[in-house]
Amino acid sequence: MRDRLAPHHLAREVGDRDAEVFGGDLDGGHAGAVGDQSQRAAAGAGAEGVVLADQAAVGEVGDEGGDRAVGEAGGGAVWAPMNTPAAKGVFRAGISESGAVTQPNDRATAPAVSQLFTKRNGLPATAAALRDVSKMRLRDMEDKLRAPGPDGSAASLLGLAPFADGTLIPATSAEVLKSGADQGIPLLIGFTAHEFAAASLSGEQPEVTDATLPAALGALGFAPAATAAFRAAYPGLTANQLAGQAQSDAVIRMPSFRVAEMRAGRDQPTWLYEFTWASNATEFRGRSFHCLDVPFAFDLLKATGVTAVAGDNPPQPLADAVHRAWVAFVSNTDPGPTWPRYTLDRRETMIWSDVPHVQSDPFAAQRPIWLQ
């Protein structure tokens, strides 16, 4: 699914129709993500690649106003480098689509994730060892890292991501967010309704029951009282479905919401969205899963692989609306007059559904969980 809807593949089909697109693949940053200390600022190597690529893009285009970074799944690798000293003046705006933006990325966590990666894959977590590993094998290795187990953690659940090394990334994403030290440039941020709820991040695992649900939520870092709160926020779901939704919330939806909340509290220009349109493809029917919004953002519903995951006849008017907002934001750092900024008094959020609309405080039921 990730390959079929990968943004850097879809970007090749955009051409120069609406905006100049520089596509990149963060797989080359795996060595930095696992914290290989054999190279300078290695823990942030993936983020360093983003900064260097954007510096090159700005130089190529000649836009003195700065670049606009867009990341899907790697949205966290957009937000993290956007707030590094090296990126000052490079970015004019950012879009984080389904980004894991406040994952545990302190320097002490990096070696722990690196050691677990090596333990589960039998390969040293170094740049030299991973340099010639195929992309598919890297993804298999990442799945092993994220598999549940007594030696796992919230950080390993996320997998590979930029870590604060004290140099390129001086502070963790959470520290930057709480301190208000982020650069405060315009940010468009959001997620899909279900993300990974339909299929576990870590592949096969035992079905969660009512009896094991509290433990499953605890493994994600939620307090025991969260069980009742999740049932209230997502009525009608089975224990197994709740566990899947909680996983999606913990990794992507909750952190993104926190970023919007904290930025809004500092009156920094922020726009929040939820993509709720659901696939009608047999394998994914009724689910708004991770990556489904990407072909809508690029307005490429007829691109290779889209029908297999979105189903027949995905709504072109929705793609027109999403794409129009993305292009407007990239061009003017504002998605348009029909999408208001996110503020704490109204919490207006764009809902990308069959009929796109703005809804006030759509996450009122989840907020007590997400802001704890």
Put a short name on every predicted segment.
Residues 75-87:
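Short glycine-enriched nucleophile-adjacent loop
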Residues 66-72:
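Alpha/beta-hydrolase fold nucleophile elbow
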Residues 6, 11, 18-22, 30-33, ...:
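Short linear motifs in low-complexity or flexible loops
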Residues 182-231, 313-317, 323, 354-372:
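C-terminal, loop-rich substrate-recognition/catalytic regions characterized by aromatic stacking residues
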Residues 100-105, 164, 173-174, 237-250, ...:
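Active-site rim elements
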